[in-house]
Amino acid sequence: MNELLSKVNRLIRRTAQRLAACEASLQKLNAEKEKLAEKERLYDMQLKNLKSLLDKKELLGEVVFRQDIFYSLRKVAVIQQQIAEINLEKQKIAERRKILNKEIVQQQAQRKHWWLKGEKYVRLKTRIKKTFKSDASSRRA
């Protein structure tokens, strides 16, 4: 009977280790997700600033020299290029977030699996102990 209890205890420890590993993995994934969200907020701020700068570069009925027009066009092209690069980075972040969400769902399923196994082994251990106690008391009687 003690041998059976020791095997069940070993199973309980193993499931607790796997559960802890799942928790650690989930924390790591959530931390990475937070970093991505922070990056995206920074990119949004940069986009907002670049778009406002782009709006300021519009020539609204002003009399300007030809060189000023070319200068403004170069500035606008640079700003538009920066906006395109930021949008590309935001797309990469969105793709990574999708992957992270899938990994998080998988880890949550694994965590649930190991938690249920652990609970099953704990219930088994209590049943074994009850059986052991009832067998011991019936032998005494």
Please give the residue ranges for each predicted region:
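Charge-rich amphipathic alpha-helical interaction elements
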Residues: M1-A141
